[in-house]
Curated annotation (Swiss-Prot):
SUPFAM superfamilies: DsrEFH-like. Heterohexamer, formed by a dimer of trimers. The hexameric TusBCD complex contains 2 copies each of TusB, TusC and TusD. The TusBCD complex interacts with TusE. Its main location: cytoplasm. Belongs to the DsrF/TusC family. InterPro entries: DsrEFH-like, Sulphur_relay_DsrE/F-like, Sulphur_relay_TusC, Sulphur_relay_TusC/DsrF. This is Protein TusC. The keyword Cytoplasm applies. It comes from Sodalis glossinidius (strain morsitans). GO terms for biological process: tRNA processing.
Length: 119
């Protein structure tokens, strides 16, 4: 079975990449067993709690990341450098528990996947 990675690089608002990636991830989880989810650059912002998308007339899809464990998606990785560059740390309040990795470890973990889909 192929190992499939989903890489989130865009923030939660401004374009539909995060929402579309999450939809694709949930659909793929019904067909694949070995899925990894990676957050880097502005993609780390997808995991922040307390977002208020209604104020910009956007849909609140970020909380849906919290149900990934119900879909047996447990391999979650966040680039620690990306979070630090945005002034975030482990205490920032996250919608799910992702493993914090250095950029080098993040890339190494990603390289173990056969297919990479970037959103």
């Amino acid at each position: 079975m192929n190992r499939i990675a989903f890489v989130f690089t865009h923030g939660p608002h401004g374009d539909a990449a995060g929402r579309e990636g999450l939809d694709a991830l949930l659909a793929t989880s019904a067909l694949a067993e070995d899925i990894g989810v990676f957050f880097i650059a502005d993609g780390v912002l997808l995991l922040l709690e307390q977002q208020q998308p209604a104020q910009i007339l956007a849909r609140d899809f970020v909380a849906t990341f919290g149900v990934l464990s119900l879909y047996d998606v447990d391999s979650l990785y966040l680039c620690a450098e990306s979070a630090a560059e945005r002034g975030l740390d482990a205490d920032a309040g996250w919608v799910l528990n992702a493993e914090w990795l250095s950029a080098a470890d993040w890339r190494q973990r990603l390289s173990a996947y056969d297919t990479v889909m970037t959103f």
